Amino acid sequence: MSKNETLFERAQRTIPGGVNSPVRAFRSVGGTPRFIERAQGAYFWDADGQRYIDYIGSWGPMILGHVHPEVLEAVQRVLGNGFSFGAPTESEVEIAEEICKLVPSIEQVRMVSSGTEATMSALRLARGFTNRTRIVKFEGCYHGHADSLLVKAGSGLLTFGNPTSAGVPADIAKHTTVLEYNNVAELEEAFKAFGNEIASVIVEPVAGNMNLVRATPEFLQALRRLCSEYGSVLIFDEVMCGFRVALGGAQEVYGITPDLTCLGKVIGGGMPAAAFGGRRDIMAHLAPLGGVYQAGTLSGNPIAVAAGLKTLQLIQAPGFYDTLAARTTRLAQGLANVAREARVPFAADSLGGMFGLYFTESIPTSFAEVTQSDVPRFNAFFHKMLDAGVYFAPSAYEAGFVSIVHDDAIIDATIDAARGAFASLAA
């Protein structure tokens, strides 16, 4: 057996499914998960020594590539000072100031350790602020694994064909209303029917957990208008797209100002870190100022903050996002071109440093369209590319990520590998 196979067999004895997050298990695509030993730049290496071009980037955080020397130096500089204090630090003030500077809708921000904590806390805050219970989310949007958000969600739930997780009590799920993404008419009907009950609407302005699906400007404009009209809190879940699609996130791209924003991934630079923030009058309801309780032992961890702060500083370099977007577009268009040459039904889209690959005739705009993907053909493509040393997301329903160190040569090598993969699919 290969070392990957041996490790997977061993892992399954002590870890449910052999992995600590379901999509890593390769259950959707089949085969043996790759156990990663090290990474550098745009590449990582598995336990058997195979090198891969990495297009998951730890599911988004590695926008600078792996082991960026300045991020590494920033982390090494603070390691000797202590790993965790359970008390305030100057560095957490600095990262809060940086986030508020880069995302104008965020007047105050609270650090947490995961995207799930960020969305869970933001929703509790919205309920406390409005004194209402009902929340609205959208089919296929994934906002972490808090009970009220695991209703018709995306990400691993979509990968494994379970629209709602087992273990979510009906009494909790009943407070969550699920609408179709990008459906303005349905949204308006919902607000007309029970708008005065809605505490919050939470949305991925660029969905990345039912593959990459962009919100239409009209949809987000309607969300902003209706939330303002009915006094509901509009939450942008930018855990994935924040600092990924633009320096100011999707809200900069669309020109829409949410009341609260959830961030993660990039703001930790590869370390466990996330945040939620927004209007000062809403954030004032958080303890110790207000009655909405939220806490975390490792929130604002100094090592994670060091990595995140340096990452946020580096992505402000002139031309950073223009270069990142150009390279991601080069990848998406190149893959679409070679698929067309092979006459394989396929579409690709990109925004900033995110991309989506769809085994469909056109780019989807909703959960229902995403689920029309030819999953068996995607799975075959995934393994052809994996064998060629290219690691895409092991699911037809996950977005991909490009880093600033994925240069044209790396992207062109990926496209060349895809040419052979698509040709074999057409045979």
UniProtKB/Swiss-Prot annotation:
Supply the source organism for this entry: Paraburkholderia xenovorans (strain LB400)
The record lists the lineage as: Bacteria, Pseudomonadati, Pseudomonadota, Betaproteobacteria, Burkholderiales
Compartments annotated for it: namely: Cytoplasm
InterPro entries listed in its UniProt record: 4pyrrol_synth_GluAld_NH2Trfase, Aminotrans_3, Aminotrans_3_PPA_site, PyrdxlP-dep_Trfase, PyrdxlP-dep_Trfase_major, PyrdxlP-dep_Trfase_small
Q: Which UniProt keywords apply?
A: Cytoplasm, Isomerase, Porphyrin biosynthesis, Pyridoxal phosphate
Protein family per UniProt: Belongs to the class-III pyridoxal-phosphate-dependent aminotransferase family. HemL subfamily.
Protein name (record)? Glutamate-1-semialdehyde 2,1-aminomutase
Which cofactors go with this protein?
pyridoxal 5'-phosphate
By its UniProt entry, which CDD domains does this protein fall under? OAT_like
According to its UniProt record, in which pathway does this protein act?
A: Porphyrin-containing compound metabolism; protoporphyrin-IX biosynthesis; 5-aminolevulinate from L-glutamyl-tRNA(Glu): step 2/2
The EC number(s) given in the record are: 5.4.3.8
One of its GO biological process terms is: protoporphyrinogen IX biosynthetic process
